[in-house]
Amino acid sequence: MQNFNEKALAVTAEVSKAVLGKPEVVLKIMMAMLARGHVLIEDIPGVGKTTLAQAFARAMNLTHNRVQFTPDVLPSDIVGFSLYQKETGKFVYHPGAVACNLFLADEINRTSARTQSALLEVMEESAVTVDGVTRPLPQPFTVMATENPVGSVGTQMLPESQLDRFMVCVVMGYPDAEAEMEILARQPRHALLDRVQPVMDKNDLLTMQQQVDEVFMSDEIRRYIVELSRATRQDGRLALGLSPRASLAVAGMARAAAYLSGRSFVAPQDVTAIFADVTHHRLRLTEQARTGGETVENIIADVLHTTPRPRPEKPSHGR
C-alpha cells in the first residue's frame, strides 16, 4: 500500500508543476479519483481549470478527451451514435467523446439541458446506452467538468440530479502573486504542461482504487457520517439536504483521505477535512435564509460543530 500511496502523492506533485499555488485543490481531486468519483471545478475563466484536468491526464498517463460545451453540442457528441453501413447492411456504433479514462467537460453549464442529461447515465453507471445497447466505458473512468459561476453570460444552473453525481466541487481561486509571476515567466501556458511527467498508469490507478475501497471504516465513523447528513436534512435553513448518495461520497472521500495519509482506517478528521468539498454544491438554501444573508458555508460549519464526533482511536483489530 505504501508504494502506491507514494505514487499518488507523486501525481499531485507533478500536477502542481502546471497548476501553481493550488496544492489543496490538487489533493482533493486526487482523492476523488481514488474514490472513483467525478469532479466539478467551478471558477471564473482563465484561472487554469482546463490546465488542471489536462495535467492529471498527463501525470497518470490516461486517455482523455475534451469537449467544449456550447449550445450546439449534441448528446451524440458525448455518448456516440450508430451509423448505417450500406455495404454490410448493419448499424455500426461510433464511440463518443466519453470513451476514454478522463473526460473533460469544459464549461458544462453553457450547453443545453438535453446534452447535460446525456452525462447522467455516464456518470452513474460508467456506461453509455445508444439504440438500446449498453456499452461499458474504459476503466478507470472520471468526468472532470468545469463551470463558470452562475450569472456569467450564457450560463445556466446545473440540475440537482447532475450536481449530486459529482463527488466533489472545488474552487480554483486566483493564484497568489508569486504563482502568477511564475505563470507569466512560463508563457505560453503549454510550457507549464510540458513540465508534467507521467509517474503512473491506469493499472496503477485501478489498484489504488481497490486499496481505497478496502480502507477500514468503523461503525462509529459510519454513524457520524449519517448523523452529519441527517443534520442537513433537518436544518430549516436548507431547502435541500444531503442525499444517501452524498453520504456515500463522504465515505469514499474519507477513505481516500486516510489512504493518502498512510493509514488503513478512517479517522474522524478524515471526514471533517473533506466534508465541505463533498457537500457544498449539493445544499440549497431556502429563500428566507438566502434573503436573510445566510450562507451554505456557515451551515456546514454549524453542522460540523454541533454533531458529536467519535473519539479518534485506532481499530482494535490493529488495521
State where each predicted segment sits:
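Pre-Walker A (pre-P-loop) alpha-helix and adjacent loop at the N terminus of AAA/AAA+ ATPase modules
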Residues: 2-47, 230
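Walker A/P-loop
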Residues: 33-70
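C-terminal engagement/docking regions of AAA+ P-loop ATPases
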Residues: 234-319
